[in-house]
């Protein structure tokens, strides 16, 4: 009998160890890991350099909050800024938290402009997380079911409806950001047309909005680093 909450549809397999792209279950069966922990084990399993780095750090410090300067954070942030073309980095615990931060940035941006009730345009088939705020920004009815009331302030449009996006922005002066996945990952791997993304950036520049890309799934390397291949760079 399991004492875990039944909130996951678990498969009847329990893994024992992994090496590179391979996994072995407790019975010794070998599997090619095409899931990568839902796109987070981007360097594979038991990479010797990573194992050494984790063991070395664990022997020194496990955690020492962000009240203090952390040299390794600074080093990694510098590399991320160098390779991404963005200006600053916020480290957090999950993709959900990253998207919550993006939503907060957009709202704070709106408040700084004197907008009391900031609105964010999101896409109907995107997935941004399972917290109340990120769930409210997610259009999949099967994910949203049973968790209302939702956080207000999100406006859904079809991912190909650039004219619809422009119309909303022109009619609703509370819009502060357009938030989207360059590759929609929840219902299949569906890239958004580059002309649409270019148009979104033009709308954002024209109306002083934030263009925010959620690459928690597609940005960890499985399908390249999408924003680096886009015709424009996001603000967030």
Mark where each language-model region is:
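Glycine-rich loop-to-alpha-helix module at the N-terminal edge of alpha/beta enzyme cores
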Residues: 2, 30-115
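Short, acidic, Ser/Thr-enriched surface-loop or helix-capping motifs
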Residues: 25-26
């Amino acid at each position: 009998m399991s004492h875990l909450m039944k909130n996951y549809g678990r498969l009847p397999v329990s893994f024992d160890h992994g090496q590179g792209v391979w996994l072995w279950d407790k019975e010794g069966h070998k599997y090619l890991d095409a899931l990568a922990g839902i796109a987070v084990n981007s360097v594979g399993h038991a990479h010797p350099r990573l194992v050494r780095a984790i063991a070395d750090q664990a022997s020194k410090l496990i955690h020492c909050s962000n009240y203090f300067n952390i040299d390794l954070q600074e080093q990694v942030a510098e590399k991320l800024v160098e390779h991404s073309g963005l200006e600053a980095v916020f480290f957090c615990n999950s993709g959900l938290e990253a998207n919550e931060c993006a939503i907060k940035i957009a709202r704070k941006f709106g408040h700084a402009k004197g907008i009391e009730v900031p609105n964010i345009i999101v896409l109907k088939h995107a997935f941004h997380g399972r917290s109340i705020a990120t769930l409210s920004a997610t259009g999949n009815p099967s994910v949203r079911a049973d968790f209302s009331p939702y956080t207000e302030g999100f406006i859904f449009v079809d991912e190909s409806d650039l004219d619809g996006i422009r119309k909303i922005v022109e009619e609703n002066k509370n819009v502060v950001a357009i938030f989207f996945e360059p590759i929609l990952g929840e219902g299949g791997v569906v890239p958004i047309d580059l002309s649409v993304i270019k148009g979104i950036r033009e709308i954002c520049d024209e109306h002083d909005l934030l263009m925010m890309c959620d690459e928690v799934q597609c940005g960890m390397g499985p399908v390249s680093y999408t924003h680096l291949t886009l015709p424009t760079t996001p603000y967030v």
